[in-house]
Amino acid sequence: MAATEQNLRSTLKVGLEALQLQLSEQQINQLLAYQAMIAKWTQVYNLTSVRDPAEMMTHHLLDSLAAVPALQRYLHRSGLEQGSRLLDVGSGAGLPGVVIAICCPQVAVTCVDTVAKKAAFIKQAALALRLPNLTGLHARVESITESFDVICSRAFASLADFTKWSAGALAPQGVWMAMKGKHPADELLALPENIAMFHVEQLKVPGLDAERCILWLRPVS
């Protein structure tokens, strides 16, 4: 039986409580509306291979939400709580970029993807969900000349490729936030000497029995 909106709302609220993430009712409604948009667009444009609403909630929304507290802590420690800029590389359906834009309205989020339809979806989501802090960009990340305080990716590419391709968009004191499954020891070994991991966090995604982690990286001289 397909999950009803009430079931999804309940799963989301339980997940938010487990993550100790306090959101307003408006933000919860935006997250649910966003998932409904993904489901609708996926019927035509295949934004994601996950079609079941309950699975989409755990594998996409809650998986992305699990990274938000870590991002908020970093922004707080770095004095970037207001006016910071985040780039989500290979954003696809906007995961985690749109989720971050909903949860962190003070962060200007740009989601970049090389697939035009996916970038168009982000632009539509920004309008439909009334997110003035969200921008969709159809481009290769290597071509971006603006600078960002945080550059993130979720299951996008190897750490070496992710950092190499996006280095031109990193602000002088900027960092990379890479969302991964299992701790990618081999990928870390393949990083060039001028990029260092300075923090790693294990994530527990509510309702998902799988390994998840965030790796924080920055350039070193």
UniProtKB/Swiss-Prot annotation:
Entry binding sites for S-adenosyl-L-methionine: G90, L95, V141, E142, R154
- Its name, as the record gives it, is Ribosomal RNA small subunit methyltransferase G
Gene for this protein? rsmG
What EC class is this?
transferase
**Organism, as annotated:** Polaromonas naphthalenivorans (strain CJ2)
Q: Which PANTHER family match?
A: S-ADENOSYL-L-METHIONINE-DEPENDENT METHYLTRANSFERASES SUPERFAMILY PROTEIN (PTHR31760:SF0)
For this record, an example GO cellular component is: cytosol
- The region annotated as signal peptide is none
Coiled coil (residue ranges): none
User: Which reaction is catalysed here?
Assistant: guanosine(527) in 16S rRNA + S-adenosyl-L-methionine = N(7)-methylguanosine(527) in 16S rRNA + S-adenosyl-L-homocysteine
- Cited CDD domains: AdoMet_MTases (cd02440)
Q: What is its EC number?
A: 2.1.1.170
Provide the GO MF annotations for this entry. rRNA (guanine-N7-)-methyltransferase activity
| Subcellular location(s) of the protein | Cytoplasm
The record's section on Pfam families has: GidB
Give the keywords, sorted.
Cytoplasm, Methyltransferase, rRNA processing, S-adenosyl-L-methionine, Transferase
So what family is this one in?
Belongs to the methyltransferase superfamily. RNA methyltransferase RsmG family.
Described function: Specifically methylates the N7 position of guanine in position 527 of 16S rRNA.
Q: Which domain of life is it from?
A: Bacteria
Q: Does the keyword rRNA processing apply?
A: yes
Q: Which InterPro entries match?
A: rRNA_ssu_MeTfrase_G, SAM-dependent_MTases_sf
